[in-house]
């Protein structure tokens, strides 16, 4: 069984169809690449898989659980995240403030604290640097953030 499946997804921006029935699967331990020209839909596919966009059709099972109706922040808690190219951090804010920006719409303070601890467990360097300005982090540290 595949760890991740993308089954015949169709994604639109308004009336414009951006993705026309893309399918692929990723087995555990497998690495794949999305290759295509500028504007071919690579980023749209990744945004859809990570919950930033919702397909009009198709399914995206991840470890047996359908992702299409799950909000992006919950997909992250399942262990999948989209790390965009570039280092889009708030340079004048601390690491901790940057992380908290990702939770600004969430109300459950206990859940936010647990999520923050999970991030720090996965990225101990960020915990060490939580009070440091994000703009002063190395490139790799900014990608972690």
Language model: regions and residue ranges:
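Conserved ABC transporter NBD signature motif
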Residues: 58-66, 78, 112-116
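Helix-to-loop junction immediately C-terminal to a conserved catalytic motif
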Residues: 50
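Conserved structural motif at the start of ABC-family nucleotide-binding domains
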Residues: 4-6, 19
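ABC-type ATPase nucleotide-binding domains, specifically the catalytic core motifs of the NBD
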Residues: 14, 70, 95-114, 122-127
């Amino acid at each position: 069984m595949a760890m991740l499946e993308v089954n015949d997804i169709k994604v639109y921006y308004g009336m414009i169809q951006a993705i026309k029935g893309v399918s692929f699967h990723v087995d555990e331990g497998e690495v794949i690449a999305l290759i295509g020209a500028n504007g071919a839909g690579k980023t749209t596919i990744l945004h859809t898989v990570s919950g930033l966009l919702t397909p009009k059709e198709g399914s995206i099972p991840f470890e047996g659980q359908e992702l299409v109706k799950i909000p992006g922040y919950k997909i992250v808690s399942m262990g999948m995240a989209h790390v965009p190219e570039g280092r889009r951090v708030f340079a004048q804010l601390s690491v901790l403030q940057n992380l908290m920006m990702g939770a600004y719409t969430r109300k459950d303070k206990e859940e936010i604290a647990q999520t923050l601890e999970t991030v720090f467990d996965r990225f101990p360097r960020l915990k060490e640097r939580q009070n440091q300005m994000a703009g002063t982090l190395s490139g790799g540290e900014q990608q972690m953030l």
